[in-house]
Amino acid sequence: MALLNNQDEIVRPVANFSPSLWGDRFHSFSLDNQVADKYAQQIETLKEQTRSLLSDAACGTTLAEKLNLIDIVERLGLAYHFEKQIEDMLDQIYKADPNFEAHDLNTLSLQFRILRQHGYNISQKIFSRFQDANGKFKESLSNDIKGLLNLYEASHVRTHGEDILEEALAFSTAHLESAAPHLKSPLSKQVTHALEQSLHKSIPRVETRYFISIYEEEEFKNDVLLRFAKLDYNLLQMLHKQELSEVSRWWKDLDFVTTLPYARDRAVECYFWTMGVYAEPQYSQARVMLAKTIAMISIVDDTFDAYGIVKELEVYTDAIQRWDISQMDRLPEYMKVSFKALLDLYEDYEKELSKDGRSDVVQYAKERMKEIVRNYFVEAKWFIEGYMPPVSEYLSNALATSTYYLLTTTSYLGVKSATKEDFEWLAKNPKILEANVTLCRVVDDIATYEVEKGRGQIATGIECYMRDYGVSTQVAMDKFQEMAEIAWKDVNEGILRPTPVSTEILTRILNLARIIDVTYKHNQDGYTHPEKVLKPHIIALLVDSIEI
């Protein structure tokens, strides 16, 4: 934020955010209706063939064959077409095999992970048969690479106190790392990829794009599934490009790049974020709403963090609390731009949702916006006063400024099934939401520590922890990483049955956690600096189609 010098002149920092990587690339997109219709017709035929595959598997195949088919359909991004059919199959599997009698590591690991991901509270003890008297996994398993790979993936759905799964992670990781250089493709690629990014913590759409290319190399692939996946991917990508074009034009019309040059220009990255929350076609409205909100809160964040002075920010904060366009007259010229855009955006949401009689839920998102702005102002005052709070005080404020209370609430606006009761549940900050917010906060703090330190920020989470406990930077970062791992266990626990809300609602929270794991990979801030982390994903998901 800006400071006053000894002559009471405002000294504003020169914005050093890199420009958008994309320019006008996504501003216009013309849908080829002929190609889209052709794809859609083929997809309908392939969908029925896949439905038959699932029906046949449900009636007359082995447990391993059932699980493998479900796993492939999910990884290829096709499961949204067959949700009830897959749920019925899994319920059948769960009831038919209550003692988990599969004897091979591969099948049991696959069974455990898939059932856990669908909310079944399966005990970790089913893996004890693969351990010796000392609780160590038997070395005889070290040659079962597929089994180890599925054990590794299964270990990432662990919750608190699951020591067997902790041991499973360590054991499988060590042996997969040792084996990886000696494996043949496509298994070698799968192992290397998994060690870099576990399936459970990855963005589903990113994994779909990756797995289609891997599945194509498989010797015993199903050509119906492969073609279905490619066509479905490309058709859905057309919809995503249309939505991104809408968001990009909205962003360009606001002209923040010119009027607010201190702020990050990240509309494309904002849209990518929403694809992580929900990629399926029925969430089109939700994606556009969420992308615009992320872009808007980024502007507000940078206004507090990189430009405004305390007196300006105090008025700005108060104006947003009052949420009235008449407050604009109190603001300096540059703040009027974002203030009006903010109020206009939420008014648009109300108009849009009124068509379905749901405009009242926008108020929940407004309250979260007011909350985050209040907390941004607290951080601004800490900065100007040179105040370093105890880490507990820091976190109580910084959880809101992570943006995840706001973004989770906003993610439900365009979800037609989200009821007022769902928003009320979320407004009470349930444990799974608190975990998600904590995850976002501590991972962000690790990734942005050096940059914030360079900008003179002293009230960072890492600095506060170091001061409170008299420890080194590395020890503080290790502690924050430990907090992230605890948060992930809370998230995993929160999706297990019985649940207070629907799976559709909980999946948004899980997916928001996954976005953090991908965006901040290797402690990099992929949103602010998308060149290394997000650019390859954006090209794969929004530029390059799959060759049919």
Swiss-Prot record:
One of its GO terms (biological process) is farnesyl diphosphate catabolic process. Belongs to the terpene synthase family. Tpsa subfamily. It catalyses: (2E,6E)-farnesyl diphosphate = viridiflorene + diphosphate. Mg(2+) 1 binds at residues 301, 305. It is found in: Cytoplasm. One of its GO terms (cellular component) is cytoplasm. Sesquiterpene synthase involved in the production of viridiflorene from (E,E)-farnesyl diphosphate. Can also use (Z,Z)-FPP to make several unidentified sesquiterpenes. A motif (DDXXD motif) lies at residues 301-305. This is Viridiflorene synthase. Signal peptide: none annotated. The Asp-Asp-Xaa-Xaa-Asp/Glu (DDXXD/E) motif is important for the catalytic activity, presumably through binding to Mg(2+). Its EC number is 4.2.3.88, 4.2.3.-. Its cofactor is Mg(2+). Binds 3 Mg(2+) ions per subunit. It is an enzyme of class 4 (lyase). Expressed in stem and leaf trichomes. Detected in roots, fruits and flowers. The keyword Lyase applies. Mg(2+) 3 binds at residues 444, 448, 452. Keywords: Cytoplasm, Lyase, Magnesium, Metal-binding. Its main location: cytoplasm. GO terms for molecular function: carbon-oxygen lyase activity, acting on phosphates; magnesium ion binding; sesquiterpene synthase activity. Pathway: Secondary metabolite biosynthesis; terpenoid biosynthesis.
